[in-house]
């Protein structure tokens, strides 16, 4: 479980100390702030650690980052790479290759490895060492990043829904003790969401599909669903049927494709899923409706930067 994330001088300015979970019963958090405070960037930095996108750390200005998973601590420091560029050139403009990232595991930072951008791009021995350390300490964690803005730009998640429908079909053909409960939660969420003039059908023959409530009972392709409908199905199916134990699901601005009534049900949907599955969910949002104004679940980045207000 991701318990905390601390970053100093994000974009050269912001210092944040985010506590995500304090117990096994505390697995949902919402990161909120106005535009420009780094909500989405924080999700991408977390994703970059767990999914080994280390080149991303050279693109984002920051001084130090500390991420805690259960009892394991990973620390990253962005330092000047003196061998890449003469000092007089570094004073003119900062480029990705002007920096190195120092990785260390543990609270004492006794053992550390420093990577340059060239190390990452050339898949050097030093990169292998860092990846092995990350894998050793965080091997039990899986991280999934769902970007709602990409849902609005592209329709690639329709093909992802086809894959998840096939997965559901396999689960129906080979059920376990939880399958019936998982199906019940999925049906609750779809029913609560009131998809417009359509209903879901679930079968061992095809997994799931949506059918229009017309005389012809027109069967819909996945790409016929709206971006909001796709998002609800994608999140629900992944977290209910595919996410392994202890999975961390990162969701970026789900309200962008949701009507206000759907936003009001979002926390209820997440709680129903998290209550059944041992997964953790971290959501970046502008909308307090998404977390039903339960501010105990929210981390306000603006408030951390302006505690006096």
Task: Show which residues each predicted segment covers.
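Switch/communication elements of ASCE P-loop NTPase nucleotide-binding domains
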Residues: 1-79, 203-309
């Amino acid at each position: 479980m991701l318990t905390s994330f601390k970053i100093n001088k994000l974009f050269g300015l912001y210092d944040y100390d985010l506590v995500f979970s304090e117990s096994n019963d505390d697995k949902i958090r919402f990161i909120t702030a106005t535009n420009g405070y780094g909500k989405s960037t924080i999700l991408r930095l977390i994703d970059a650690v767990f999914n080994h996108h280390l080149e991303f750390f050279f693109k984002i200005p920051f001084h130090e980052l500390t991420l805690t998973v259960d009892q394991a601590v990973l620390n990253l420091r962005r330092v000047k790479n003196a061998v890449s560029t003469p000092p007089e050139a570094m004073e003119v403009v900062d480029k990705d290759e002007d920096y190195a990232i120092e990785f260390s595991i543990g609270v004492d930072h006794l053992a550390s490895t420093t990577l340059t951008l060239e190390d990452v791009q050339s898949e050097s021995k030093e990169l292998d060492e860092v990846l092995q350390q990350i894998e050793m300490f965080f091997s039990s964690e899986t991280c999934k990043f769902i970007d709602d803005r990409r849902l609005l730009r592209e329709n690639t998640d329709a093909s992802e829904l086809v894959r998840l429908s096939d997965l559901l079909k396999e689960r129906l053909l080979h059920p376990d003790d939880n399958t019936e409960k998982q199906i019940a939660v999925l049906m609750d969420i779809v029913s609560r969401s009131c998809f417009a003039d359509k209903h879901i059908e679930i079968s061992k023959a095809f997994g799931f599909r949506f059918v229009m409530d017309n005389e012809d009972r027109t069967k819909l392709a996945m790409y016929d669903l709206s971006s909001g409908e796709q998002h609800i199905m994608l999140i629900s199916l992944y977290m209910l049927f595919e996410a392994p134990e202890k999975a961390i699901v990162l969701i970026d601005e789900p309200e962008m494709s949701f009507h206000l009534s759907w936003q009001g049900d979002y926390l209820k949907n997440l709680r129903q899923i998290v209550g059944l599955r041992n997964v953790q969910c971290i959501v970046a949002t502008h909308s307090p409706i998404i977390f039903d104004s339960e501010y105990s679940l929210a981390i306000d980045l603006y408030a951390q930067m302006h505690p006096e207000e």
